[in-house]
């Protein structure tokens, strides 16, 4: 572990427009140019607008033209996800302007946002009098590898998610030459798609609020929450390293945290920090910026790991990879390789190989890149896979897309109760994820609902931070609002009379300070007075507990439990830490603790 210095602290300023509309001036009507753009481009520049539907809703762009060329592209209105959709848009905008072409591929990992952006830009180009169809026939532009990339390095890291960035930055901070490979066109993995919550025992908010906690208590929660299947030694590394990893994120990464914590199911006390912006992008985007400032670290997007290279003794001494955008192949030589490419939740075939119940009927919250490529790659050289049958579902996900519902965090804010179509509660809302998921499967249509009211919503920042998600859910009939409980029930066909009784009973429990039905373990907050909201949800595959077997030094083990020299793994890539089930917010702790462990130990070999 490197020494931490407050001189290295980078303040975490507010991240603008997270999940919301970019507050830029309104746009001109379609097909109508603005007046000459003063001071923004060359003489005679004009602005044209185009609109399309993105993943977050309406996307409007302004294209600045100078004669027959595109000088600049500005998003006027966008609710695309920060660090994901916005990253894809940035890539395409740069390619289009630099190469004067619309012949570009969609950015993998941000496909929907990319398609919408290209459609909107094409719309604006047509409005200018030029023909987008002709621009799309021009020479194709593709993202290029980082300038100065060399294949002779000290450490290769595969997967630019939380664990990958932690490993790569730690090794680079130790003075080693590092390359970080990401097969998608954007970085972040599942970390950037998550809420970014991080379980940290003995943190300053607990001390402020008089909450007693300890490393041992968190470790016990994780072991019990995973039904005593996880390796206690690995769990202890996570819990003991949590506070240091949190400090590293602040002082070395510039990550800022909200001034409150969140209670996740299965934990015995509240201990989970929330990043500024309430999303994993509040962490990943800061780490990516930190990486950009290091000359000895190169981040290679669109670069897929193909094969591990070993010497005569069996030690891993490099890796073969392919740039999927350019077709260029690389033969990296390194003293160590760190695999941090996440799980396999998006690979249905692989899921069913280890757990036949996890078939295509169950959607996934995971990144499209979570396909288990590196599990297979490492297994080919003798690495041991462990706990692969344990696959977690997240209980409150979109019934149509499978995406994790952040509006569903009303449950974690202790402001909602879980009900079924019959209007009854069916589970303790703060239970383990697997317990809630299994309970939902037993309900009518395999769907659960949660009810909350305006007062509860106003006690959180959920409506503000997740405005785009709420609008989308209303539009697709997955979220309903009514002045009365009966009005909110109507779109879903929920038994309103029974739900009225359930809410009244709940409010009584809140006054009494106890829940005799399900022994609710968090703060009891009543749901009194409208307007009322009801959200539909069902479980989606969220996390794969199994992966490469590692030891406490993050070394990958073979079938005889012996370390494979030169090979490390971290994050969801590595198994046998969580057991049968993972407690919420422990994954973020894991990726940054073991990412740093892997990075430090890999650097020690170089």
Swiss-Prot record:
Q: Which SMART domains match?
A: FMN_bind
Q: Which GO terms describe its molecular function?
A: FMN binding; steroid dehydrogenase activity, acting on the CH-CH group of donors
Enzyme Commission no = 1.3.99.33
Q: Which residues form the active site?
A: 433
Q: State a GO cellular component annotated for this protein.
A: membrane
The family database entries (SUPFAM superfamilies) matched by this protein are listed as: FAD/NAD(P)-binding domain, Succinate dehydrogenase/fumarate reductase flavoprotein, catalytic domain
Q: Which family does it belong to?
A: Belongs to the FAD-dependent oxidoreductase 2 family. FRD/SDH subfamily.
Q: What else is on record for this protein? A: E.lenta strain DSM 2243 is significantly more abundant in subjects with type 2 diabetes (T2D) compared with subjects with normal glucose tolerance (NGT).
Q: What is this protein called?
A: Urocanate reductase
UniProt source species:
Eggerthella lenta (strain ATCC 25559 / DSM 2243 / CCUG 17323 / JCM 9979 / KCTC 3265 / NCTC 11813 / VPI 0255 / 1899 B)
